[in-house]
Amino acid sequence: MNSFFNSVSDFIHSVTTPDRYASQQRSSKASQSAGANSQNRPLYNNDDNQSEMYQASSSYTGGYTNSPSASSSNLAGGAAADRANPYSSRNNSTTNFSASSTSVNKAPYAPGSRSSAIGNNDPAGVTRDSHELQEYVDGQPPAPSVAMSWERIDKWADEHYPELNDQLCYPATASDLNELEADLDCSLPLDVRDSCLIHDGQEKFGRPSGIIFGITLLDLETIAEEWYSWKKAAIRINREIARATGQTPTKQGGIFINPNAGSPNSSTPGSPVASVARQKNISSWLASQDSVPEGAVQLVYAHPGWIPLANDRAGNNIAVDLAPGKKGKWGQVILFGREFDRKYVVAQSWAHFLAMVADDFDRGNWEVDHDTEELWFKTDRGTFVSYFTVLKTRVERQFRHQMQRREHERRQAAAAAQQQQQQQQHHAQGGLHSPSPQHTQSMPAPGLGKPLTSKPAQDLDIVDLNEDTATIKDKGKATMGSALRKTIVDESKTAHTIVEPLEESEEIKGKGKGKEEDVNEAAEKAKVEATEKTKKAAKEAADKEAELKKAAEKAAEEKAKAEKKAAEAREKEEKEAKAAAKAKEEELKKEEVAKAAAKAEEEQKATAAAEAAKAEAKRAAEADASKKVEAEKAAAEESKESKAESEESKVERDLEELKIDEENGNAEEADEEADDDDEDDEEEGDSKEGEETKSTTASKSKSKKKNKKKGKK
């Protein structure tokens, strides 16, 4: 009945709240739990009944306490002791567990602490209206804010891969993060919380590609599942270490009883053969655990303090390290997983990591395969590589010299361990089966199978990402990791294979009782010879290693000289190229000046031609004007002549009329002379007047004729 009501309340909680991870019952319990609020309590899990495992000084407590006594404690013996018991408290870092050194909030974080701190004065005098300056870390400025980095990533995804952008989840809530911290029993860094408050990872069953160049960003639920899976792996490995060392299982010691102890097919923890077999596998596996930079990450395969935030769905993870090594930093981003016996610190914090991803997107180092819907990192040469390889190569390039020195030390340690292991095997077998010189020289280090790296560190092409850097791996890692995992699965078989030589030696002893002294003497002699030959072989190997080192140094010097010569040649070529470019530039300037002069001359000629054409047009216009004036004058003269002609014709008509009138008058006068004799005097007067008029008319006609002649002329 309670389960039914719990289901109903969970459903109502999921509908009425934006929580994605938190539930009603778990949220109420998480608020009362001491997991996230406890500063001194290490990680544990009551479901596994293994809480005692993390309470002893030899368990996973390194890096999970803030008390001065716990943070300053360390096992004696240095690196050798750490390798013998890698799960001990080995965190001598001064970095605070609960707050990043770049964070404004210097107090250990607990759910609700930031909200309650608003409005309160800080003990150092920092008020809510002031801003505390952030310190530089390792000479580097603080990382950009998580919100700014996510804004750049979202902008790129929205422009270039909107389908992938749709797969990013909605923000998580404060309740989700508080419950996750309670489940993980830790306090997450502030930048991780800020990132989850922007995007709660990607959809669990979305597209195959991840937002981090094909690497999937995990949501809170998947983070909890992955963390729990790797935590169980760490517990299982701790059990194997307990069996191999044969320690007495006690609650205070953090070691558990071997479940196979006392069975007829297995050896007891104190059995010499079982101890040799287990120590061989454990030592070989521990020898493969490494970190770059040195001492930054604990030398273990898995740790509950590593919180996975992204993975490639193949067992490789990008995580924040909440249990760093003595030279590490709390909250650093590391690579760990199935293919990473050597752990790499790729960023100081999750904020730095997101800023680096955003920079890679902005530089254009990406390619989307639309056929497979995969997002790849693209090099400058156009080749596609895994982003895990890119991150690993960047770290190796930064710590190249340190890796070379450590590789040399590791080889010397492997040779010494080989000699010691041969002596232990000889004592365990009673000295009857001493290794031959050929076998001694060809036998690898105990449990290593192959050197940790297939090539010297100086031969690794870790500078150029465009090469297939995926092939640059430690060939012995897979062998060593698989050897330990095989021991975990089937320990009885391994113990049985080691027992066989001992049974054979017992049979030989039974047959040779009569010659026991001769056998012992021969065995001692063979033992001495083998020891001398082993020392000689070790010395030769050391000499050869020194010669190889000298040859490598010489090759490095020659390479440096060649690079210097090449740089000088490039500098000379650059100077010559600059001089040639300068000469060409001057020549181009001269050509431009000549072109400008020619153009100016052409413009001047064109201007002169235009002026000449203008003057010619002006002269033509003047000629036309003079012709027009002459035409107007001629027209005026013609009009005058026509007018004179019209006047002359009028005068002629008047003269004709006068002649007619005169003739008519003469006729009338003749008639009147006959009728009127008395009027002679009057007629005489009239004739005189007629003569005057005639003379006047004649003079007028003469003047008109003269004018007409002048007009014709």
UniProtKB/Swiss-Prot annotation:
Pfam families, A to Z: SMI1_KNR4
SMART domains noted in UniProt: SMI1_KNR4
GO BP: any one term: fungal-type cell wall beta-glucan biosynthetic process
InterPro entries (alphabetical): Knr4/Smi1 (IPR009203), Knr4/Smi1-like_dom (IPR018958), Knr4/Smi1-like_sf (IPR037883), KNR4/SMI1_regulator (IPR051873)
Biased composition (Polar residues): 35-65, 260-270
Protein name per UniProt: KNR4/SMI1 homolog
Region (Disordered): 18-129, 255-274, 400-457, 500-713
Comp. bias intervals (Acidic residues): 663-686
Family assignment from sequence similarity: Belongs to the KNR4/SMI1 family.
